[in-house]
Amino acid sequence: MTIVPVSEIPTVSLLYHLRKLVPATFKNEVDAPKPSQSFNDRIALIRGDITKLQVGAIVNAANNSLLGGGGVDGAIHRAAGPGLLKECRKLNGCDTGSAKITDAYELPCKKVIHAVGPVYSSRFVNESAEDLAGCYTTSLKLAVANDCKSIAFSALSTGVYGYPSSEAASVAIKAVKNFLEGADGDKLEKIIFCTFVPKDVDAYNHWLPRFFPSTEEPETDDWEEVEAGESAENGPVAKEEGISTTEEAKVALPDVPTAEPTEGGPATKKLKPSDDDKKL
């Protein structure tokens, strides 16, 4: 599969321009966040295989052992080779809501950040959200501390850990925006949300415009909503023609590996998940 350079991963600004992301509408101006061209030029969204991204760091949806598991976790360990597991064995695990960093070995990125998201609990929604936000905030801090200029997140906790995709996307995007507004926010040149299954794709298509609104006036006549039952792989599509093949190529990536890992995962992760659960 083709390696994807960070420069070819579409930003929110580009997705708005290509009519791949629908601008949000707000009931009143008070509810609407202030648009930021700077933020929109640094936040990116793509659907595909996170192991093929040539970025500073990718964020693995890890478990507490950090020894590999199913879905994205297993795919990253397989693509990185045995060196990653060897280094992870020295880390003595990781607490839920936190993250640790390793080298990337055979992956095209420079570092792998292993974030341990929460198992979702409908009884402790606030605690789940706090732990999930902690994964994103800690990962961003680790990226900056290790001189990474770009970082790509998988959709943490939305697979077998049961976090509803829409709620998880909202927590993730809010945590990233809070970081951008902080003291170290200008130290990362690109922050990427890498999705794969349709429920995560739809969640980020919905929430990104609500935290990072378009800086241009929306032209509603140009939009055609994805029909029910269709995969919203690239979000809503434009009625107008003229988008170049090169621009289109930036919006899609090859499929993520789906085979189970050969070692390192706890017993619960050895169970074969459904298609929608092939990641944490």
Stretches with model-predicted labels:
Residues 46-50, 97-105, 139-144:
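Short amphipathic alpha-helices and their capping/turn segments at secondary-structure boundaries
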Residues 33, 37-96:
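Short, conserved "active-site rim" segments that organize catalytic pockets and cofactor/ligand binding
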Residues 43-44, 56-58, 98, 110-114, ...:
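Structural motif
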Residues 86-119:
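Active-site alpha/beta core segments
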Residues 120-280:
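Phosphate/ribose-phosphate-bearing ligand recognition and processing surfaces
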